[in-house]
Amino acid sequence: MNAQEANFDGLVGPTHNYAGLSFGNVASLNNEKSAANPKAAAKQGLRKMKQLADLGFAQGVLPPQERPSLRLLRELGFSGKDADVIAKAAKQAPELLAAASSASAMWTANAATVSPSADTGDGRVHFTPANLCSKLHRAIEHEATRRTLSTLFADPAHFAVHEALTGTPALGDEGAANHTRFCAEYGKPGVEFFVYGRAEYRRGPEPKRFPARQTFEASRAVAQRHGLDETATVYAQQDPDVIDAGVFHNDVISVGNRDTLFTHERAFVNKQAIYDTLTATLDARGARLNVIEVPEAAVSVNDAVTSYLFNSQLLSRADGSQVLVVPQECRENANVAAYLDELAAGNGPIRDVLVFDLRESMKNGGGPACLRLRVVLNDAERAAVTSNVWMNDTLFASLDAWIEKHYRDRLAPDDLADPTLLDESRTALDELTQILRVGSLYDFQR
């Protein structure tokens, strides 16, 4: 059946800021307490969506979550009217207010793991929201994520949206940032590839400096609940040394699409065995794996982390060629820029490189791949997505005007204490639900 990969990008929320909340994420820590520009951040992401849609790629939009999260702050013991809750948190525990105000749901690669209907046991598209239990500011996202996905992908004949896995370290799940899929064609059965940082119940290497956020047990549980064919499911461990170098998700060191794996030579433990397994498994499904392995001598792990070369989107054009979507930081790193020039000039599957300014997101450790959730849909499934979330000229104009109207152009950490920020955000989100036609999505609307 004809199918296409759609990318659903997260709209950056009005409270986008740099609070340095993500230990293990080098960019997040390096830019802690800098002033952010939410308006620029949202428009940078929106422009990427529009340009990719103009190039013929299926591009959807996911709305921000409500922030600050008054639910979290009240759960943590702050009481009173909304303004009082914010004031008390700002005075007594500003770090908790920062966690409650994070716009991190913009990185929808962590929203969920998605398996297309061609791979699942019941022939439906399956979504498992990620519990993101390693970080407080992200662990509060999964309920709203499930509500959003259930709203957009509402038809039970086509879609199954699960609850997140139990939020315990043994089942730490970071979503599609540690998952990719290989196939001959999007609509045919493929090979699902899960990458984990550690195993809770199996002895093996682990990072020493930064935490491994994804467990083998979580990856296996997602595969099982999606009803995947065990013979078409491959698990791999990310090299703990690269986690300690700042590769907190696999999509910072590797990206795959169709029959191509673009990866750094230090990405995986026992890499050759992984390549061999993927090759054999994909061969049984009618495709030959192309591994583009970037050597350390050309691009170091540090270069990869600072430029986010691998936190890129690898997209298939109608003619079968592929394009790599990278942040502009890749052009500012001499080693990475030289490698990309050589890559595009070669005879491999990647024939073109598109560069985007995503500076605001990048300063928090999120490149093009972080901002999107891949969802393979056949024609009937796409038709079942009835909300106004597909990017086109009209939606772009509406969202651009909405951002211009509602977003601040400067937000420093101290500004999170401003109670009017909550009112501004709710006003903006209320209007957004009308633009996207998603109904009463937020708690404050219910």
From Swiss-Prot:
* Metabolic or biological pathway: Amino-acid degradation; L-arginine degradation via AST pathway; L-glutamate and succinate from L-arginine: step 2/5
Q: Which chemical reaction does it catalyze?
A: N(2)-succinyl-L-arginine + 2 H2O + 2 H(+) = N(2)-succinyl-L-ornithine + 2 NH4(+) + CO2
Give GO terms for biological process: arginine catabolic process to glutamate; arginine catabolic process to succinate
Q: What is this protein called?
A: N-succinylarginine dihydrolase
Subunit-level organization: Homodimer.
- Listed binding positions for substrate are 19-28, 110, 137-138, 213, 251, 364
Q: What class of enzyme is it?
A: hydrolase
The encoding gene: astB
Organism in which the protein naturally occurs? Burkholderia ambifaria (strain MC40-6)
